[in-house]
């Protein structure tokens, strides 16, 4: 169960009705493929299960960056309490120290390498892949390597020439919207996690919005998109295991909504915080600083832990005995409530996402929820939510700088 409650004044439906129609039209057009991913993942899961069923491996190394890795890390962190088939490590940066640390600590013959790049030409990913090949010097990469990429990409052509397994990403699904495609499903199957439940959760979110006509998400998008002063959106997650989801949200929100149309610039800056620890750093800025922030809280109702504060009374610290005997998970959720109400009392726009427990189904719901929210705000801004021209400029400059260094 995932429930979203809004603590600000809602708009009249007449104000948001046109945006609902445009979001429906976009989803039905077939041009933006992520909308349909909840309905088309079963074949990928079946194919992945067939591939991994006879494989013997202790480690999985995922090589990818941005949308090819950040969502997988969110899954790994959120579900780390579950027993997994292997240990997953992620190489998502040109960091030689981390590369050495990982490659020197695993046994090649008991490792599956997943090379993940939608375009197939991501310089960081391919550079790390080359370094892996140079380090291990495998005679047959089809035994240990699989590839996730666009159909027809240069990386797919390389994989096919090497007789290696390839999983494709639909052409009309952008990288940061691809977590419900092979990008997320294949690593989940490799880890022994319930990938079907992830899709079921996302399908439930889709049904709630498009079939049940729940306007909560649209109201939230409209309020945040049209807020006069608040151009910073804080996701305050009260669970350590949601730190990865925060990172995924930051990429999705920033890369999708930070756009320029002519001389007009758009964007809502995303910030991910983890409660309660970030109450002791960032909360002061939200409470007493510039009123340029809205806050979305997430709390997990059942954290699957009965750990309590011991009934101990320490000399000179007995003023803190009021927490004795209370579950830590209950305390952290009460901290969420207290912080939220403190912000409401200050007139700050907040909303609360309550999750019954952290499992594959609810995680799938959250992924689809934030993707829909991003699309809705993009429509309200009138920007192209699905491109990233600012990033492409940097890539071209990088190539010219590297070539210049080689002269």
Residue ranges, per PLM feature:
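A generic structural motif
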Residues: 117-122, 173, 187-193, 240-241, ...
């Amino acid at each position: 169960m995932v429930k979203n409650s809004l603590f600000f004044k809602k708009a009249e439906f007449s104000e948001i009705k046109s945006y609902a129609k445009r979001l429906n039209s976009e989803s039905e057009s077939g041009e933006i493929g992520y909308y349909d991913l909840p309905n088309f993942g079963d074949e990928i899961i079946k194919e992945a299960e067939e591939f991994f069923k006879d494989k013997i491996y202790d480690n999985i190394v995922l090589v990818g960056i941005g949308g090819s890795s950040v969502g997988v890390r969110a899954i790994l962190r959120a579900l780390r309490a579950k027993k997994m088939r292997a240990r997953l490590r992620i190489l998502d940066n040109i960091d030689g120290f981390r590369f050495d640390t990982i490659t020197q600590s695993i046994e090649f013959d008991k490792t599956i390498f997943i090379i993940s790049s939608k375009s197939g030409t991501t310089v960081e990913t391919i550079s790390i892949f080359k370094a892996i090949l140079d380090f291990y010097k495998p005679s047959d990469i089809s035994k240990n390597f699989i590839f996730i990429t666009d159909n027809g990409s240069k990386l797919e052509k390389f994989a096919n020439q090497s007789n290696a397994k390839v999983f494709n990403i639909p052409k009309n699904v952008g990288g940061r919207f691809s977590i419900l495609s092979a990008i997320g499903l294949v690593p989940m199957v490799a880890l022994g996690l319930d990938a079907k439940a992830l899709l079921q959760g996302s399908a439930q979110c889709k049904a709630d919005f498009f079939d049940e006509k729940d306007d909560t998400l649209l109201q939230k998008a409209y309020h945040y998109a049209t807020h006069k002063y608040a151009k910073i959106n804080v996701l305050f997650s009260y669970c350590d295991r949601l730190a990865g989801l925060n990172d995924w949200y930051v990429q999705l929100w920033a890369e999708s909504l930070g756009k320029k149309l002519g001389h007009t610039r758009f964007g809502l800056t995303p910030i991910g915080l983890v409660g309660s620890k970030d109450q002791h750093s960032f909360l002061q800025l939200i409470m007493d600083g510039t009123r340029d922030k809205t806050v979305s809280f997430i709390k997990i109702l059942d954290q699957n832990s009965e750990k309590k504060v011991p009934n101990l009374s320490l000399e000179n610290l007995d003023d803190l005995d009021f927490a004795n005997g209370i579950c830590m998970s209950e305390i952290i959720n009460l901290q969420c409530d207290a912080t939220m109400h403190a912000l409401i009392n200050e007139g700050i726009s907040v909303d609360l996402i309550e999750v019954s427990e952290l499992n594959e189904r609810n995680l799938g719901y959250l992924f689809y929820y934030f993707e829909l929210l991003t699309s809705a705000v993009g429509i309200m801004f009138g920007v192209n939510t699905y491109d990233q021209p600012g990033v492409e400029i940097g890539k071209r400059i990088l190539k010219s700088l590297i070539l210049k260094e080689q002269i």
